[in-house]
Amino acid sequence: NPNSIDSKYALKPFDMTWVDGGRYAILGPSGCGKSTMLNIMSGIVKPSEGRLLFDGVDVTDETTSDRNIAQVFQFPVIYGTMTVYDNLAFPLVCRGYDKAFIRSKVNEVAEALSLENLLPMSAKKLTADQKQLISLGRGLVRDNVAAILMDEPLTVIDPDLKFRLRRKLKEINQKYQSTLIYVTHDQNEAMTFAENIIVMDEGEIVQVGSPAELFDRPKTTFVGYFIGAPAM
């Protein structure tokens, strides 16, 4: 609440360009502003100052539904009374697409996510990682999605499955050329997933760079220790 006398801004001023089709991680400790940045992009939170542009168009005042953004939250959001197929089809059904198109897109995305054998199953019977894949799949079925925003999406996933899911996310990025923005406080997740990492601390972007750049040339002591760079 920046209008309060004693309050601090959740995010300090910054100017950031996200390249279409890129794979990003927003990395930093809890409470540093990562989720706030993500929620401003999706439209859940409106910034008190500044503007947000999509391909040069100002969308700061646009609703979430008008931004063509998909968001995957920390805990899977699924419809337990529906089948896996119906969960994946739901965004298209709501937008009035015909059944043949819906079937084609759902089957395509289910195959990409290795969910094709689960389509007839009740979604409530799935494991946590399978439910999170459904959340991701609902973003992928829409052709007009500009970016998929993920807020610590692997928190509820067993450690032995995390690497497999990060690899699957990379495959999705390459197949669909979707912009993926991934919030995490886990250095290993960021370093093994992203092409570019945005390191944050106390509402400020401290450094932006590839995993190799951050590891070899950290700009600050904070970045060095947080990344685990040998130079520090």
Where are the regions that the model predicts?
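The feature captures the beta-strand-to-loop junction immediately N-terminal to the Walker
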Residues: 27-29
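Helix-to-loop junction immediately C-terminal to a conserved catalytic motif
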Residues: 42
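Conserved ABC ATPase "signature" region
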Residues: 58, 93, 100-118, 170-171
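ABC ATPase NBD coupling module
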Residues: 58-70, 75, 94, 99-103, ...
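Short coil-to-helix segment of the ABC ATPase nucleotide-binding domain corresponding to the Q-loop/switch region
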Residues: 82-91, 122
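Conserved ABC ATPase signature
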Residues: 122-126, 130-132
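Conserved ABC ATPase "signature" C-loop
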Residues: 127, 202-203
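ABC ATPase "signature
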Residues: 208-209, 217
